[in-house]
From Swiss-Prot:
This is Glutamate 5-kinase. GO terms for cellular component: cytosol. Its EC number is 2.7.2.11. It is an enzyme of class 2 (transferase). The gene is proB. GO terms for biological process: L-proline biosynthetic process. Disulfide bonds: none annotated. Catalyzes the transfer of a phosphate group to glutamate to form L-glutamate 5-phosphate. GO terms for molecular function: ATP binding; glutamate 5-kinase activity; RNA binding. It comes from Escherichia fergusonii (strain ATCC 35469 / DSM 13698 / CCUG 18766 / IAM 14443 / JCM 21226 / LMG 7866 / NBRC 102419 / NCTC 12128 / CDC 0568-73). HAMAP family: ProB (MF_00456). NCBIfam families: proB. ATP binds at K10, T169, D170, T211, G212, G213, M214, S215, T216, K217. Substrate binds at S50, D137, N149. CDD domains: AAK_G5K_ProB (cd04242), PUA_G5K (cd21157).
């Protein structure tokens, strides 16, 4: 083994259930064994786990429930305690304690809460405790959900200061096409940069059960790689896959980390789930992408969602493509009022101003 490294392992529903309605405990035992072996060798392990709803449904005897958010949250509330109990029981076989962290998007959007979550996670790791992270599905609404555990795992990797992020799924990795419908599909072993062509390939692929398909795994890889974290998509069923990844053995698809990673604040901006969205005109798009300029109110065409000053927002071009993320200098209502106006008009329109730009270039990351 090499010197101590920090690894985040994301386990999707398809991996934990094997495609069935219930948790595949035998397989989870094997995954824990692999993690415990690495832990004993001095590595730091973080688990991002799905499966709370599946565990809740199993524990309640597969009840007939209406297909509502409330039903899913009921199952998550029951299942989350069962899930963490399972992780605790299995890791305790190896004398390892686990610590549960349940997160929502609000913990990522707010810089102070983000830093608090980081400090908690790193304190667990510093004390040889394995953090087990999941989205707080029992209380999360659509407005406060990260949305899927792929993107949550990328945020966890940033919080942990991880060296590697391993996304385990029911596929061997990212293919040139969906291997289940195209026999000519080939495994892509190495990726050195994520572009629109690769996003198009991922958009046509499906990774099985759960909320995250290949497109969300690509989003997670993009966030992690730009933060300097190697990311691997691999099959959770492959024997010894977790140890192989830590040994540097080629498995699945390896997304190579960016050579010059983003500094810490910009990692937060890039990784935080956007609280809202603004659409900008062609001139603003060119200024942002080609000249690295700040976004002026004049270039804003529309504002979507409700957000506060200081929150991270998504910036899209007229075709709806996500071109940048940035910290808004104004709340959503104020941006709607000053959209399309020159900067010198801000004070007259609002009665105050926080500067001449809507999003400053120092607080912006292009996609």
């Amino acid at each position: 083994m090499s010197d101590s490294q920090t690894l985040v392992v994301k386990l999707g529903t398809s991996v934990l259930t094997g495609g069935s309605r219930r948790l595949n405990r035998a397989h989870i035992v094997e995954l824990v064994r692999q993690c415990a072996q690495l832990h004993a060798a001095g590595h730091r392990i973080v688990i991002v786990t799905s499966g709370a709803i599946a565990a809740g449904r199993e524990h309640l005897g597969y009840p007939e429930l209406p297909a509502t958010i409330a039903s899913k949250q009921l199952l998550a509330a029951v299942g989350q305690s069962r899930l963490i109990q399972l992780w605790e029981q299995l890791f305790s076989i190896y004398g390892i304690h686990v610590g549960q962290m349940l997160l929502t998007r609000a913990d990522m959007e707010d810089r102070e809460r983000f830093l608090n979550a980081r400090d908690t996670l790193r304190a667990l790791l510093d004390n040889n405790i394995v953090p087990v992270i999941n989205e707080n599905d029992a209380v999360a609404t659509a407005e406060i959900k990260v949305g899927d555990n792929d993107n949550l795992s990328a945020l966890a990797a940033i919080l942990a200061g991880a060296d590697k992020l391993l996304l385990l799924t029911d596929q061997k990795g990212l293919y040139t096409a969906d291997p289940r419908s195209n026999p000519q599909a080939e495994l892509i072993k190495d990726v050195y940069g994520i572009d629109d062509a690769l996003r198009a390939i991922a958009g046509d692929s499906v990774s099985g059960l759960g909320t995250g398909g290949m497109s969300t795994k690509l989003q997670a890889a993009d966030v992690a790689c730009r933060a300097g974290i190697d990311t691997i998509i691999a099959a959770g069923s492959k024997p010894g896959v977790i140890g192989d990844v830590m040994e540097g053995i080629s498995v699945g698809t390896l997304f190579h980390a960016q050579a010059t990673p983003l500094e810490n604040r910009k990692r937060w901006i890039f990784g935080a789930p956007p609280a809202g969205e603004i659409t900008v005109d062609e001139g603003a798009t060119a200024a942002i992408l080609e000249r690295g300029s700040s976004l002026l109110p004049k270039g804003i065409k529309s504002v979507t969602g409700n957000f506060s000053r200081g929150e991270v927002i998504r910036i899209c071009n007229l075709e709806g493509r996500d071109i940048a993320h940035g910290v808004s200098r104004y709340n959503s209502d104020a941006l709607r009022r000053i959209a399309g106006h020159h900067s010198q008009e801000i004070d007259a329109i609002l009665g105050y101003e926080y500067g001449s730009v809507a999003v400053h270039r120092d607080d912006m990351i292009t996609r």
